[in-house]
Amino acid sequence: MVGVNFFGDFDLASLAIWSFWAFLAYLIYYLQTENMREGYPLENDDGKLSPNQGPFPVPSPKTFDLADGRKIVVPSVENEEAHRRTDLALERTSVNEGYPFRPTGNPMLDGVGPASWVPRRDEPEVDAHGHNKIQPMRKTEMKVSAGRDPRGMPVQAGDTEVVGKIVDMWVDIPEQLVRYLEVELNSGKKKLLPMTMLKIWSDRVRVNAITSDLFDTIPDIKSPDVVTKLEEDKISAYVAGGYMYAKGVKPYAL
C-alpha cells in the first residue's frame, strides 16, 4: 500500500488539503493583481496618490494585442491619462475624503454627477467583421416584425410637452435590437434617444427623464449615419442625468 510502504506515516490527506489552500491563495493573489491593471495606483479625491494602496502590489506592465490591431500596455501612465477627465466643474463639500462633490455649473452640460461620461475612443463600435455595430434602420435591410413601430410618432417630454417626432430607429445589428430612436425636434435638429430611457405607447413616445427645454442640448453626433463610443456615452449620460437634474417632470399622462 502506497501510504505505508512509500510514504511511511506521511498524511496524504493533509498534503492534499494544504496543497489546495496554497493553490487557492495563489489564485486569489493572481486574480486580484490582474484586476489592478487599470485604475491603479489608488488616488484621493484630489487626484493625489492615496497613502493606503492596499495589501496587493500593482502588477508589472503587460502588452495586450487587440482585435483591431492596436496594442495596449497596462498598467501605464499613458493608458490612465487616456481615460482621465480634468477641469471638472465640481467643488468639494468637505475637506475630508469620501464626501460628495457639488456641481459648480450646469451638471448635465458639464457631464458630472449622474450625467458623468467617460472619455471613450471617438470611433464607432464594430462587430467581428469590422462593420459598425449600430446603424440607422434606413441603412439596413431590417424591419419591425413585431410590436409597435415608433417611426412617425410624436415625442412627449417629461413635462408632457411634444418636442418632435421619431424619424428612425438605430439598430444593434449583431444583437438584433434597437439601441436608439432618432427624433427630429420642432427646431429641426435631430437627436438620438437611448431606447432604455423611453417608453413607446400606442400614440406617442414618452421620455420621462428630461423636460422639453433640455432636448436641444442633447449631445450631437458628427455623422448622420454613425455614432461613436464617445458620443454614445455622452448621450446616455446626458439623458440619464435628467432623472436627477431635470425640473418640472410630471407623471405619465394617460
UniProtKB/Swiss-Prot annotation:
Keyword Transmembrane on entry: yes
Localisation per UniProt entry: Cellular chromatophore membrane
InterPro entries associated with the record: Bac_photo_RC_H_C, Photo_RC_H, Photo_RC_H_N, Photo_RC_H_N_sf, PRC-brl_dom, PRC_barrel-like_sf
CDD domains: PRCH
A biological process from GO: photosynthesis, light reaction
Highest taxon of the lineage: Bacteria
UniProt name for this protein: Reaction center protein H chain
Species, as recorded: Rhodobacter capsulatus
